[in-house]
């Protein structure tokens, strides 16, 4: 910096101190200018905080955000492609559900249901990734550009104007000691800077409908996300309801213990057992129908709910007398006749065609 430049900086600093400490009054700016300056300052602070809060809204885990930022920075330094995206909570939940759904298998109700919901969560995570990209492209990036370009430019103009104001006020206090031309030039420079700053602030505030459009893009992106999320959740809800209906329509299975082991204490003779004297007790054959006539064995208990139905217990042998239709048999048990559902029994001797 030249000697003249250093001298000018010293004069500005002297004027600033005299205003702050000594109570000297500087050139006043008009109310319209100060109001525009206030609105620009609020806009600048709003843009910074809203960008930060939007990122927190989309990516709520601070540890994951920090890790992702570090990975992307390292990838950029190494000249690699952009690293992995933010790990959505829905994707993590989907992985767990799909894993245990596979482990449980198709033989139970819970396993396939876990797989259904896991797939839905996976779809939700993909829709959430789309939301992230949409909001970044149409909301965060434009705000970042507004901050880095327009607002920064305005701050530069205001700073330059303030420096020229201090220079003008310093020279104005020394009017008579300085050439009039020097004072006139200082005033012209101050007015010029004030006009540029005022014009840039006016243009920014006048075009704030652009920020409204960016807000609209944010809301539209969220609306689209929630529409797709609703469709995904409705589909999986329908699947789960179907599974519940199907399971409730199935006959209730009763636990039937297997025959217990017994010890054979007999000695002598040919022992045909090869397991150290341990044998399994045999289940007695249920009394009921003769096996040389059409009959069936009850797989479950059946409680008659309507007149004409035949009740029985699991394991009962029922004599078959007739097939009413594809869903019902007619049979006899303990001297009583009635109807019962086909899917409750296992055919031992079929009815003749």
Swiss-Prot record:
Keywords: Cell projection, Coiled coil, Cytoplasm, Endocytosis, Endosome, Lipid-binding, Membrane, SH3 domain, Synapse. Gene3D superfamilies: Arfaptin homology (AH) domain/BAR domain, SH3 Domains. GO terms for biological process: endocytosis. Residues 291-350 form the SH3 domain. Residues 181-201 form a coiled coil. Residues 1-27, 243-290 are annotated as: Disordered. Residues 60-87 are annotated as: Required for dimerization upon membrane association. It is found in: Cytoplasm; Membrane; Early endosome; Presynapse. Its main location: cytoplasm. One of its GO terms (molecular function) is lipid binding. Disulfide bonds: none annotated. PANTHER family: ENDOPHILIN-A1, SH3 DOMAIN-CONTAINING. Implicated in synaptic vesicle endocytosis. May recruit other proteins to membranes with high curvature. This is Endophilin-A1. It comes from Gallus gallus (Chicken).
């Amino acid at each position: 910096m030249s000697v003249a430049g250093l001298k000018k900086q010293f004069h500005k600093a002297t004027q600033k101190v005299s205003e702050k400490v000594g109570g000297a009054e500087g050139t006043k700016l008009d109310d319209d200018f100060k109001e525009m300056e206030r609105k620009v300052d609020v806009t600048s602070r709003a843009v910074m905080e809203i960008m930060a809060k939007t990122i927190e809204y989309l990516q709520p885990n601070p540890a994951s955000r920090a890790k992702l930022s570090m990975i992307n920075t390292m990838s950029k330094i190494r000249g690699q492609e952009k690293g992995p995206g933010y790990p959505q909570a829905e994707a993590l939940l989907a992985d767990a559900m799909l894993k245990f759904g596979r482990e449980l298998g198709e033989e139970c109700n819970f396993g396939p249901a876990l797989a259904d919901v896991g797939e839905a969560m996976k779809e939700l995570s993909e829709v959430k990734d789309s939301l992230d990209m949409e909001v970044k492209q149409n909301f965060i990036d434009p705000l970042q550009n507004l901050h880095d370009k327009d607002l920064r430019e305005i701050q530069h103009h205001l700073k330059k104007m303030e420096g020229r104001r201090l220079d003008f006020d310093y020279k104005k206090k020394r009017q008579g000691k300085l050439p009039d031309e020097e004072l006139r030039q200082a005033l012209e420079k101050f007015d010029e800077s004030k006009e540029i700053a005022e014009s840039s602030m006016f243009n920014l505030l006048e075009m704030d409908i652009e920020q409204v459009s960016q807000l609209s893009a944010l809301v539209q992106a969220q609306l689209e996300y929630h529409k797709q999320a609703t469709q995904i959740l409705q589909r999986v809800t329908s699947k789960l309801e179907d599974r519940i209906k199907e399971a409730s329509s199935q006959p209730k299975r009763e636990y039937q213990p297997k025959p217990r082991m017994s010890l054979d204490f007999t000695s002598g003779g040919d022992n045909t057992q090869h397991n150290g004297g341990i044998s399994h007790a045999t289940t007695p054959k249920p009394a009921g129908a003769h096996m040389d006539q059409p009959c069936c064995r009850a797989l479950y208990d059946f409680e008659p709910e309507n007149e004409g139905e035949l009740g029985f217990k699991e394991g009962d042998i029922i004599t078959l007398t007739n097939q009413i239709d594809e869903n019902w048999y007619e049979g006899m048990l303990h001297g009583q006749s009635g109807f019962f559902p086909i899917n409750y029994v296992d055919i031992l001797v079929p009815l003749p065609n």
